Amino acid sequence: MNISQQFAPPFKLIAPYFIIGVLTLTITTFLLFDIDISSAHSLNNSTLSWVHLFLLGFVMMIIFGAMAQLVPVVLEVGHFAVDLYYIIYPLLFVGTLLMAFGFYYYPAILPYGGVIAFIAFFVFLLETFLTIIKVKKFNFVITSVLIANIFLFFGLIVGIVLALGYSGAIDIQVYQILKAHVYLVLIGFVCITIMGMSLVLLPMFWLSHSFS
């Protein structure tokens, strides 16, 4: 793969993602001691708050930081507008905090946190799709990135609907569409992204050229 150093984002852009991610992981680890495991399956307020704080503040934050670095490697083109990543992490961080507090204390602020987080995700998706447009030749890995981000887009739409429903802004059967949100984001985006990226990254660590 012919990767130019000019495609690599500056360290000051990437660092906040990993700093926030590690801090969130530390906080959520300690918060686990306050969660009643016997009632975790019921998706009560504390469980939903912890899950979103962990998944958005740690998992997605780390993925976004990694994607800022890996997209040029996988697509073999520069970012369409890498500076957009400077506004993604503060929006995602604020949105995550509002959602966590909304689930735990005050459901009325859930839509606000959801919208702020949605804007962060939308900026990420927009930048990624515009970068993919620059690709001249598609392969399996690039296609997997495209498909994963399409799943993420629909997962976000469902997530906003769920936030509105949980806060009481609209009348929906929250638990009937909850699985769609989980499958679209965790299976559709996270798992496909990891599998697609692995086809590029594993040969690098194994010092081989490609899968046979």
Predicted features and spans:
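Hydrophobic alpha-helical transmembrane segments of multi-pass integral membrane proteins
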Residues: 1-212
